[in-house]
A protein has these predicted regions:
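C-terminal cap of thioredoxin/glutaredoxin-like
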Residues: 5, 54, 138-214
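Loop/turn elements at helix/coil->beta-strand transitions in domains of secreted/extracellular proteins
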Residues: 45-48, 76-79, 105-112, 142-143, ...
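Extracytoplasmic thiol/disulfide redox context detector
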Residues: 2-89, 205-214
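Solvent-exposed, acidic/flexible segments
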Residues: 45-46, 56-63, 88-95, 104-108, ...
């Protein structure tokens, strides 16, 4: 019985990896993904997946719970990084600064989802830094520390670098996913967010094969 269970388990694992390889083999450039040329700088040792997003984007708000769960289940050879973009819109640039400021103060895990809710469900007015800081203070974080981070030059620099990265990846809308610095997953090839993540899995499998992995 133990040998039978072990055999069944091995068969399932084999089928899982073969499925990923088959999906990768079925991918078509232009239809399922767009090559990023020139490629973005790649991380050594790991396949980096970038999610370009904005707190101001309602689609990003809907996508956030799903992509967060998906990212937590990725293998050790995959790293996940979020990139807030502004598309040179001042109101979105402030939202990008909110993300980086929360990250800098260690409060991102606590308030990340809350920012989406505040904007898209509670219709909070985040048109000034003062309004943002007052809201954050009401959520129990250090207002002085967060306010200083939000207004710092380093946050502005991070926003600029994030926008430059989005431009280099040829991002025209969000949410958008780039894989291994070389492939931009085509949202139009997916009918919904679940399919988008499955397509992303296939592109990751392609990148893994190209790196010599299985």
């Amino acid at each position: 019985m133990k040998r039978l269970i072990a055999l069944l388990f091995a068969t399932l694992i084999s089928a899982f990896f073969l499925s990923g390889q088959t999906l990768a083999a079925d991918l078509q450039a232009g239809r399922d993904y767009k090559p990023i040329n020139p490629p973005l700088p790649a991380t050594k040792g790991k396949i980096e997946v970038l999610e370009f997003f904005s707190y101001g984007c309602p689609h990003c708000s809907d996508f956030h719970p799903m992509v967060s769960q998906w990212a937590a289940k990725q293998g050790k050879d995959v790293s996940f990084r979020r990139v807030p973009v502004s598309f040179n819109r001042p109101e979105w640039a402030r939202l990008s600064r909110i993300y980086f400021a929360l990250e800098a103060t260690g409060d991102l895990a606590k308030l990340d989802t809350a920012v989406f809710i505040a904007i898209h469900e509670q219709r909070m007015n985040f048109k000034t830094d003062e309004a943002v800081v007052a809201w954050a203070a009401g959520k129990g974080i250090d207002a002085k520390k967060f306010g200083e981070a939000l207004a710092s030059f380093s946050m502005q620099s991070k926003v600029q670098r994030a926008d430059q990265e989005a431009t280099a990846a040829r991002i025209s809308g969000v949410p958008a996913i780039a894989v291994d610095g070389k492939y931009l997953v085509n949202n139009e090839a997916a009918g919904n967010y679940e399919e988008l993540l499955k397509l992303t899995d296939a592109v990751i499998a392609k990148a893994r094969q190209e790196r010599g992995g299985k």
